[in-house]
């Protein structure tokens, strides 16, 4: 693809607005110190322009901008300002500490905004653009002008606004899809026509700022690049107003992966992407969904047997980029009900088990049976299956009775031991679960120190079951167990026995000698 490159910039400039537009996402506000921490990460990521805030909106933003200006000397630091003299003066003052400052002024241009928000005519909008861009340029040489709601603005008027802003001294023209309304074909054409027709367009950088209301923010930003845009405004994890903005990690990796098509890349240090994404998640408390492109937990995870088999042959069969290129350590072969025998055998081999063909077949059958009971199978589950294949089954719950004894509870449990004999024991405790665990300890001879215990519902309505999860210690080693039943007390007993039986199996095989292997 060959598109005339405005201003002959050698790469797509990444304008990150996580600290301004991104922070406007409900629940994502940051303190000045948190903004500085995030800005440092954006600097290390290689972002060209960091939009640091909206100084006229709060003292907190002014403080944050000044802090970033004193410390960050490489990237351009931008601040947002309305087309108001007081805003521009406040913004210019906030940028006094910055080595590479940019004033970013904006004004709505669409008929809807002109009539209902601004109550201004076309002529008044043009006059305001000229006056305030000129004012901004008097303070700082690098001035960006944004025509808010550009994609719903009459194109002839948008061309006139652009011409006036360029003539007044704007160095970057941003054409936002403020409400995520446009489509790739429309925005590509808009940029292409304006760059070709507006006087002075070859002297400025054209920029796209796309929102994700229809899920098209990244696609529209790529289309704008095809139309000649050479700056893209985006945020980490795509956070921002309403449905968010163009996601930095997605747009930059699209340019890198499809480099042969776009013939232009960003300067982003892509192996820093995942750590930067995770930092933002911690700072604002907004985790990304697991299937989020590039940075989601499942972005490089493979469960399907067909996919796993292909990945084992050649990773390019089902991955278009390397996880290491964005900061993940490696691809994940997730074991679950869709996994094939080859993936299970490979994982067992990695755990140190070398099996004959018949043993692999038997293990895979047991693996598939386990997958009917739980969504994912961990390494510990595989180890337990291997232990089950070579030693007798452990203790099984035959019956239990819980009763109140004054302020305390009494538990009677009857178990079947590994040889099939019945073992019955009683115990008292401070509540039914405490009594139950005491009786189980007496019956099995296994002493477990309880660290945590949780129960929750699994399923919906009449089919719901209780799942008990517990974390215990034995000889200083931490173990975890789960149990599921219609009765939560029974589920608790099964969770306790889950740990005890695995511990006993490991002991019988000589896997543990007091403190060797943990069961997870």
Curated annotation (Swiss-Prot):
Family as reported in the entry's similarity comment? Belongs to the alpha-IPM synthase/homocitrate synthase family. LeuA type 1 subfamily.
Q: So what does this thing catalyse?
A: 3-methyl-2-oxobutanoate + acetyl-CoA + H2O = (2S)-2-isopropylmalate + CoA + H(+)
Cofactor(s) in the UniProt record: Mn(2+)
Q: Where does Mn(2+) bind?
A: 21, 209, 211, 245
Cellular component GO terms, alphabetical: cytosol
Gene name of the record: leuA
Q: What is this protein called?
A: 2-isopropylmalate synthase
Oligomeric and partner information: Homodimer.
Q: Which NCBIfam families match?
A: leuA_bact, PRK00915.1-3
